[in-house]
């Protein structure tokens, strides 16, 4: 796998590499979210590290280890869920019980969720809240990889153990922009030649084709 680091700031890459000994103590930890996707596609600037693990973990020893890596600011610290900043880079680790669809990839010996898994998680995120970054990310997956929306929806069913007749909620969420329109546009962070209006138009055309 060839990774793209042009859209991930140096300080994020530095923390990603330096944090490996810390997260290895917990086991089963992998990177997902926007930075993982940016390493695959280079489609937008991403400045945080979102890690997941199927394992339980204690927040206090993890916080102590992270504090050794540089200036540490706790944001939300509790067992099985930790959000903080390390050297001004946001770091999060959550216990996440949903299974991986595909084998992990590896960047500098850091486990990274596959594109298929990230795509399913993005659909899940859009179904929950629909942030602009999630729409941009899913657009990038559908336009810059060979992954089809139909395959992603099948993965959603497998990953989250939901029946196919429950997919209507996620399909409908693809054209629910009320919350995302309230957010500041992140176009300055986008490396693709696309405007937010193009994103909305794309999904408004796509969603009706998925309803049988």
Model regions and ranges:
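Compositionally biased terminal segments of proteins
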Residues: 1-212
């Amino acid at each position: 796998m060839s990774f793209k680091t042009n859209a991930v700031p140096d300080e994020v890459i530095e923390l990603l590499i330096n944090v490996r000994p810390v997260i290895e103590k917990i086991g089963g930890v992998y990177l997902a979210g926007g930075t993982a996707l940016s390493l695959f596609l280079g489609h937008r600037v991403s400045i945080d590290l979102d890690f997941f693990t199927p394992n339980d973990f204690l927040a206090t020893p993890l916080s102590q280890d992270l504090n050794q890596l540089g200036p540490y600011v706790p944001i939300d610290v509790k067992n099985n869920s930790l959000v903080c900043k390390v050297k001004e880079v946001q770091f999060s680790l959550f216990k996440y019980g949903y299974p991986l669809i595909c084998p992990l990839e590896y960047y500098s010996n850091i486990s990274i969720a596959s594109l298929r898994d990230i795509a399913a998680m993005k659909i899940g995120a859009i179904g929950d809240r629909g942030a602009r970054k999630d729409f941009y990310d899913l657009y990038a997956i559908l336009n810059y990889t060979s992954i089809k929306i139909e395959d992603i929806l099948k993965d959603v069913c497998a990953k989250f153990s939901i029946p196919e007749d429950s997919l209507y909620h996620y399909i409908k969420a693809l054209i629910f922009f009320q919350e995302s329109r309230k957010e500041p546009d992140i176009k300055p962070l986008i490396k693709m030649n696309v405007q937010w209006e193009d994103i909305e138009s794309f999904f408004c055309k796509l969603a009706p084709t998925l309803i049988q």
